[in-house]
Structures are given as C-alpha cells and as structure tokens.
Design a protein with these regions (language model features):
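Catalytic-domain carbohydrate-binding cleft regions of carbohydrate-active enzymes
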Residues: 1-202
Length: 202
C-alpha cells in the first residue's frame, strides 16, 4: 500500500499539511448580515466555551447592487479591518469569505473585465436577472489573464485585510442553475479553452 500512496504522490505532488486551525470547528450559516452579528456569534462561542476556529462570511457582505466589486458594504460592515483584527487578536479565530466569479453589469470590476473581453456575454445580452433582480455574468476562469485579474481584485480588496480562507463559490459556473443544461452551457460559451460542451464544470 505504501508503494501505491508514494506512486500517487509522485503523480500529484506532495500535499502540504493544512494549518491546525483549518482542522477545527467551522461556524457557518446562510450569511451574517452585518459586522456586529458576526462578532457577536464568535463572542457567544467564546462565552459558552465552545471551541471555534473559523467563521464563514457567506454572500451579500457587499453593497446590494455591487456583486463582484469585492468590497464590504460600508453601512453593514463599517470597519472590516477592525472586525478581522478583533477575530484574530481578541477571539483567536479565523475568517473565511465567499467569493464569486460573478459581476453585476456596470460595476467597476465588471467594466474592467468586460473591456478585456473576459466575461461571458449571453446572459447580459438576454438581460437575464439573478434571483436578486440584477443582470450579471461570470468571468471566463479558463482564461489565464482573467484569473490573474480576478485574483488581483480579491487580493487587493479582501486578502490584504487579513482574510484567512476563501470559499470559491459558484465555480460551476452557476449563472442560472434552474435552466436546462444546454442553456447553462450556452451561457458560458465559448471558454478560452474551447466549447462549453467540453469544459462545463471542468
């Protein structure tokens, strides 16, 4: 068996051991709507002496009409740097943030990605709205420069603040999950690698 495992590692490469905190308890819910709600949840875990290593901040931490700009809503999350510092220093907890390859039409990052031709066009051309009522699209993650731009966006706006982990959400990509599969593929066609029929959910 050791030979099989070592042979597999030869093919895949050596996997680094995750940090100890990543193996502990993670608290997650549909979302925390504001900074004080998230900090209060962690505080309550500590008061009750329930072990907690990571808390997940799911979607809609951004302004409601700015999906894809990767900014915290300044009303609901007035001090994200302070929030993350409190999690780290006062509560010895880590923060995971969900990020999506999705952009609302007209946002700053949408315009930047669109100007390079890195966004799928069909959903915008059809004026198809998401479940919150906005027209959006996804970037082509098969395109290497687009991936670099996406990383630069989330690194500058989020990781640099001290975010510890990413939840890379909707990477299927899930523009409209209730549509027939042929239309879902058409929404992301073509990719930088070729037809969506071949690379959908790759």
């Amino acid at each position: 068996m050791d030979e099989v495992i070592s042979g597999y590692r030869t093919v895949t490469g050596k996997a680094p051991v995750m940090p100890k905190w990543a193996m502990g308890f993670w608290q997650s819910r549909e979302r925390y709507t504001k900074q004080e709600e998230l900090l209060s949840a962690v505080s309550e875990f500590r008061k009750r002496k329930i072990p907690l290593d990571n808390i997940v901040l799911d979607w809609q931490y951004w302004p409601s009409d700015k999906w894809g700009d990767h900014n915290f809503d300044s009303v609901r999350f007035p001090d994200p740097d302070g929030m993350i510092k409190t999690l780290h220093d006062q509560y010895n907890a880590r923060l995971m943030v969900s990020v999506w390859p999705k952009y609302y039409v007209g946002t700053e990052n949408y315009e930047a990605m669109n100007s390079k031709g890195w966004l799928y066009k069909r959903n915008v051309e059809k004026g198809q709205k998401d479940w919150l009522g906005f027209v959006s699209t996804f970037y082509d993650a098969f395109n290497a420069p687009a991936r670099e731009a996406f990383w630069d966006q989330i690194n500058t706006k989020l990781y640099s603040k001290g975010v510890d982990a990413w939840w890379l959400d909707a990477t299927e990509p899930d523009m409209c999950s209730n549509l027939p599969m042929d239309e879902r593929k058409a929404l992301m066609d073509p990719t930088a690698l070729g037809p969506a029929d071949e690379y959908f959910n790759a």
